[in-house]
């Protein structure tokens, strides 16, 4: 099956292992260095050895993704920083644009692709300027502009906006002769190849109901979430749940849970308003799914009386409901009227737009 190597970010002794966790008792003294990977000139094997996965959220093993050959194709760096509030990818691009370009060149060589694109929103002006300078003398790497909307970082949106190819629900970028990789994933590829470094660190954004919202770069994977809530000045009271991820697709998390390879955001929410009335929930692939929307309704003390799906939701080849055109909302008036007829007094929506 699919999987990736796991490396501890701090030194210590393994105390226990179960299906979800490897618990390490940390040594009192920690080195500033890390145990380097064995030297190799095989870059694809190096990526596999490092345990790199798609750190933007999907978690797919990068060594498997980059084993595909796409001669004449395209490698696209997903620089959308898709979810609101999050800012660590933008910070990286502002500060290390040349490193991102080097990473793209490694992937071009691995996959046989002819061109590399950095797909980014226009609102990230400082990052755009830095990347423009870094790409100036790179004939095979250029910048592609994404619309300032959610979910601009969806792979099918990126393919549509950069290559002009509309993928059907369930189709992968490979069917457009393209490979897409999140910018932080590319950062970790560069570290593995140039520094013999395994994937042991993560960039995160901490925001919401904390005193000092901030971006933390290269934090050790495995430390508890509570450490970074504290580093951000602690909670502002009253506060609600911690959301791991972004506002649209994040999920509830507990303080004691660890930072993992795909953690990007830690957002402290407001307490749920106690509406205690009948609501409808509107589901779309672009946002929160039914389970999450029901959690929100429960937190509000509301009764779910109607469940509707965006009319763009269609089954893919595996029967999973997917959005036909992510980011292009068809309007939800018909669905809202249906929920009203079902007795809903309010709507909790998981769609990409109003």
Give the location of each predicted region.
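A glycine- and small/hydrophobic-rich beta-loop-beta segment
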Residues: 234, 249-284, 288, 294-299
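Generic structural motif
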Residues: 1, 7-16
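Hydrophobic alpha-helical positions that pack around
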Residues: 114-225, 231-238, 246
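Cofactor-cradling patches in redox/metallo enzymes
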Residues: 92-98, 123, 305-354
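Hydrophobic alpha-helical hairpins/lids featuring a short glycine-rich hinge
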Residues: 23-26, 30-79, 84-87
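Redox- and metal-dependent alpha/beta enzyme cores, enriched for Fe-S-associated oxidoreductases
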Residues: 279-324
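Gly-rich Lys/Arg/Thr-decorated short loops/hinges at beta-loop-alpha junctions or inter-strand turns
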Residues: 75-89, 210, 313-319
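Histidine-anchored nucleotide/phosphate-binding helix
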Residues: 94-111, 295-297
């Amino acid at each position: 099956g699919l999987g990736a190597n796991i490396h501890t970010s701090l030194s210590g002794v393994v105390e226990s292992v179960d299906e979800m966790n490897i618990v390490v008792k940390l040594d009192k003294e920690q080195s500033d260095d890390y145990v380097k990977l064995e030297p190799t000139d095989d870059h694809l094997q190096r990526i596999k050895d490092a345990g790199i996965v798609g750190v933007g959220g999907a978690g797919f093993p990068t060594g498997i993704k980059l084993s595909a050959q796409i001669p004449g194709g395209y490698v696209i760096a997903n620089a959308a920083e898709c979810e609101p509030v999050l800012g660590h990818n933008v910070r990286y691009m502002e500060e290390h644009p040349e490193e991102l370009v080097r990473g793209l060149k490694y992937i071009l060589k691995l996959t046989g692709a002819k061109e590399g694109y950095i797909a980014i929103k226009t609102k990230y002006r400082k990052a755009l300027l830095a990347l423009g300078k870094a790409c100036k003398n790179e004939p095979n790497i250029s910048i592609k502009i994404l619309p300032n909307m959610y979910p601009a970082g969806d792979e099918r949106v990126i393919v549509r906006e950069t290559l002009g190819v509309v993928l059907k629900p369930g189709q992968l970028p490979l069917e457009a002769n393209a490979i897409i990789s999140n910018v932080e994933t590319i950062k970790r590829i560069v570290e593995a190849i140039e520094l013999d470094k395994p994937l042991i660190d993560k960039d995160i954004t901490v925001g919401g109901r904390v005193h000092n919202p901030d971006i933390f770069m290269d934090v050790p994977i495995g430390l508890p979430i509570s450490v970074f809530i504290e580093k951000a000045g602690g909670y502002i009271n009253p506060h609600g749940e911690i959301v791991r991820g972004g506002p649209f697709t994040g999920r509830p998390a507990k303080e004691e849970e660890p930072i993992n390879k795909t953690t990007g955001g830690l957002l402290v929410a407001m307490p749920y308003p106690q509406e205690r009335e009948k609501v409808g929930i509107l589901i779309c692939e672009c946002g929160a799914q039914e389970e999450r929307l029901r959690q929100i309704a429960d937190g509000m003390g509301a009764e779910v009386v109607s469940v509707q799906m965006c009319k763009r939701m269609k089954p893919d080849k595996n029967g999973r409901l997917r959005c036909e055109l992510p980011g292009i909302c068809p309007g939800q008036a018909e669905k809202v009227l249906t929920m009203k007829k079902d007795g809903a007094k309010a709507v909790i929506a998981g769609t990409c737009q109003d």
